[in-house]
Design a protein with these regions (language model features):
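Secondary-structure capping and domain/repeat boundary segments
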Residues: 1-210
C-alpha cells in the first residue's frame, strides 16, 4: 500500500506494482490523468499464477507433474519404483505449498544386490555370492563345473543369466549317471567269457547271479 499527496489538477502516474505469485491485472477503477478534487483510493486487481513441479524419475515409473495455484497445498506423490533399485528420495524437498516458480525434482536411487547361488544338488550349495543388479557376469565369476562320483556333469538348470536379474537366482547342476563295463574272465585260462555294462550304483550281487 502506498499513499501520496498530490495537488489538485496535477498529473497522476499509476505506480508499478508486483506481488509474488500473482499477475497484476490493472486497477479496480480507472486512474485519471489528473488529480481530482477529492481523496481517491485505487485497488490493484490480481490473478494468482500457476506453477509446475516436474518429477524426473531417472528410469523409474512416470510421475505426473503437479500444476496448481501459487500458495496452495502440495500433496506429495507416491514414491516411484524402478526395477533393481530402491528409491532413496528426491534431490530436493517437495514443498508444502506451491512456490512462485516452476521446479524439477530428480529421483535418487540405491542399486539393489541379489544373490547368485550354485547348487550341486537340491541340498548341497557350491557357492553363493551377492551382486549388484545388472552386473555383467564374467567367466571367472561362474562356479567351476562340479564333479560327483559316478555321474557326468551336464550343465546348469535354469540356464545361467548374462546379467544379474532383479531377484535372487539359484541354478542347480544337472547330472547323467555313468555306466561302466564289468568283464568276467575264467580263473584258469583268463579268458573273457562275459561282459556287462551297468549303471553306477547298481547291485553287483544281482549282476553276478544273472
Amino acid at each position: 500500500i502506498s499513499r501520496e499527496m498530490v495537488d489538485y489538477g496535477s498529473a497522476i502516474t499509476a505506480p508499478t506494482v508486483a506481488k509474488e505469485g500473482y499477475t497484476f491485472g490493472g486497477w479496480e477503477a480507472d486512474v485519471p490523468s489528473t488529480m481530482p478534487a477529492k481523496d481517491t483510493t485505487f485497488t490493484a486487481k490480481w490473478t494468482v499464477n500457476q506453477y509446475t513441479i516436474t518429477f524426473n524419475t531417472d528410469g523409474g515409473n512416470k510421475i505426473a507433474p503437479i500444476t496448481q495455484d501459487f500458495g496452495t497445498a502440495v500433496e506429495s506423490p507416491a514414491d516411484p519404483t524402478r526395477e533393481g533399485y530402491t528409491f532413496a528420495g528426491w534431490d530436493g524437498t517437495i514443498p508444502a505449498t506451491m512456490p512462485a516458480k516452476d521446479s524439477t525434482l530428480k529421483a535418487q536411487w540405491d542399486i539393489n544386490q541379489y544373490t547368485l547361488t550354485f547348487k550341486k544338488n537340491d541340498e548341497e550349495v557350491i557357492s553363493s555370492e551377492k551382486y549388484d543388479y545388472g552386473h555383467v557376469f564374467h567367466e571367472n565369476e561362474m562356479a567351476q563345473d562340479p564333479d560327483s562320483v559316478g555321474y557326468s556333469f551336464m550343465g546348469w538348470s535354469p540356464e545361467l543369466p548374462t546379467k544379474m536379474p532383479a531377484e535372487d537366482f539359484t541354478t542347480t547342476a544337472q547330472w547323467t549317471i555313468n555306466s561302466y563295463k564289468i568283464s568276467f574272465y575264467g580263473d584258469l585260462d583268463n579268458k573273457l567269457f562275459h561282459e556287462v555294462t551297468v549303471e553306477y550304483g547298481s547291485d553287483l550281487e544281482d549282476i553276478i547271479n544273472e
